């Protein structure tokens, strides 16, 4: 039944417009994140930033500052084609006279049929805080993608991987508190050193730290200004080379074998 609390009247210049709240909680709340870290991204912003990159589900993705796991979880949901909001309820579900219950059931069933939960992906999330890593695992479990993500306690200075053409997509500390700002030069230097050791990887990073490029040691290929809530941030994009096409890769493999 439609409640009066779902209706929002707006009076503007003697004209009244009545709007209906169909969602309840804000749409950026997917329903899986009960545990959060100090400075979490909204789920919607994390998903949008991932889609701004050329990452595809056949490429490895690592977040070395995973916090509550938002980037890895959203990436896994994109890869598995899990519709946003599958883990939450909407106010309009209770509107018996406006939206038939069967329509909700049919819509959810259709979304479930399109899911590919058995997909093989390599998505990893690291954080230096063991409790935060534990929270990320719990959030991933609620989202139904815990089997698709490897979470581990690890410092960014220890970031390395043998795979090529991977993606680092991350939200490192901004240093919003004065005492944290003193640690940022060393932290971003470590990010730059770790990235330099990754063969042919791309780095995508959202931060409000304006000296990020200076301490990373190179200028970003692209830089987008984005507001994370009320905080002006920058989405730095350090682009690695594209992987060779399958035919080219096969030819190079044959050449190497012939030379042996």
What kind of feature is each model-predicted range?
Residues 155-259:
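C-terminal catalytic and target-recognition region of SAM-dependent MTase-like enzymes
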Residues 11-20, 236:
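C-terminal edge-of-domain segments
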Residues 41-160, 176-177, 183:
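Conserved S-adenosyl-L-methionine
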Residues 18-54:
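SAM-dependent Rossmann-like transferase core, predominantly class I methyltransferases
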Residues 10-15, 162-166:
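A short, glycine/Asx- and small/polar-enriched loop/turn
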Residues 5, 59, 166:
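Conserved acidic residues
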